Regions:
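Residue-level signal for inorganic ion chemistry
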Residues: 59, 141, 196, 304
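A generic, well-ordered mixed alpha/beta core segment in the N-terminal half of proteins
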Residues: 90-157
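Glycine- and other small-residue-rich loops at beta-strand/loop junctions that grip anionic moieties
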Residues: 100, 125-127, 168-171, 209-213
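General beta-strand structural signal in soluble alpha/beta enzymes
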Residues: 122-126, 148-151, 166-168, 192-193, ...
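Phosphate/diphosphate-binding glycine-rich loops and adjacent basic-rich segments that engage nucleotide
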Residues: 150-210
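Short, small-residue alpha-helix embedded
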Residues: 300-311
Length: 333
């Protein structure tokens, strides 16, 4: 005899998170953006693990399809920051590194090392190797002697010894890391990849952000402006914070909530040929002065200048300082 499920005679109560999914997914005419307050509440429920997995997937993919608004990103960021238990450490630059590189080596890592040698305190954070065929910061930390920190105390110690630290996202926002890790389950990157770039967990003086896809740079700048943050957003090479010297670079800035724009000319007369393959040992060779190569030196000098611009130096002065720092670097590694 077959046992049948009982009939549903009463309408089940709606899940508290359901309205947020409905707002985003209610058809072409019925759907709308979340307000900043709604975004803060929705992200708070995600972080507090008060949603079903099906709701999480639906929410992330609806956002991905729609594209996040500045108000949504600001609200999401506020929810994350409210739940952080980070110490009050003095930091100059927040340097998110989530994209990975595939066309050029991550020369920006040498830029960060050189800045740190000159007293610029930098926090780097990333979300691991989520996409095949890319070279990620986490894979190079040991060889480049960038401290891998697993808690804020280790970050503080690293700052005291060398002004540079990397901490994985999963060690200070595990729920966000879980969402990023859905990349290969859902088949698409989620909006968390974008959100992570805004978080600036230690409230650094300036947050650098790289957004590769056209049109998104202004959205991120506007979101940071709503938060009152000081940031520079660029279209960095491969989605990482690295100036491409072969192209014009547009800087989308926000200082204390006030927007500004700046355009930097290309640094090379003609485009460089991309390497046939990525050889990480070339990073150390360039640092040690064993090889000379136009592209990486232009890229890392300009990237250092970008960080210095974020700390208030005018462009020309930032480039002069960056060149001085690079020429005088401690080449041991």
């Amino acid at each position: 005899m077959t046992d049948f499920a009982p009939l549903t005679l009463e309408t089940p109560a709606e899940h508290p998170f359901a309205p947020f999914v409905r707002i985003l997914g209610k058809g072409k005419r019925g759907a709308r953006n979340l307000t900043r307050e709604e975004a803060r509440e929705a992200m708070g429920m995600l972080l507090d693990e008060k949603v079903e997995d099906t709701q999480l997937g639906a929410f992330l993919m609806l956002l991905r399809h729609k594209e996040e608004s500045p108000e949504e990103l600001a609200g999401f960021t506020e929810a994350v920051r409210e739940r952080l238990h980070a110490p009050a450490l003095k930091v100059d630059i927040d340097w998110p590194t989530y994209a990975g590189k595939k066309r050029h080596l991550p020369w920006f890592l040498l830029a960060a090392k050189c800045l740190a040698q000159n007293g610029v305190r930098i926090l780097m954070h990333g979300g691991g190797a989520h996409t095949a065929g890319r070279l990620y910061t986490e894979q190079l930390l040991e060889s480049l002697q960038i401290p891998l920190c697993r808690n804020w105390q280790q970050v503080e110690t690293a700052f005291e010894h060398g002004n540079l630290a990397f901490i994985p996202l999963g060690d200070w926002a595990p729920q966000l890391q879980r969402m990023i890790d859905l990349r290969n389950t859902l088949g698409l990157r989620s909006p968390i990849h974008s959100l992570a770039r805004l978080l600036n967990p230690l409230n650094a003086r300036c947050g650098l952000q790289s957004i590769f896809h056209p049109g998104y740079q202004g959205v991120h700048r506007d979101a940071s402006g709503l938060l009152g943050d000081t940031v520079i957003v660029v279209k960095g090479d491969g989605g990482e914070i690295e100036i491409n010297p072969d192209t014009i670079s547009h800087l989308y800035g926000s200082t204390g909530g006030e927007s500004w724009d700046e355009e930097w000319p290309a640094l090379a007369a003609q485009r460089h040929v991309k390497p046939a393959s990525l050889e990480p040992e070339q990073l150390k060779a360039l640092w040690r002065g064993e090889v000379e190569d136009s592209y990486p030196q232009l890229a890392l000098i300009a990237t250092m200048a970008l960080a210095l611009r974020g700390l208030g130096h005018p462009r020309e002065q930032a480039f002069e300082l960056a060149q001085q720092y690079w020429d005088a670097r401690d080449k041991s590694i």
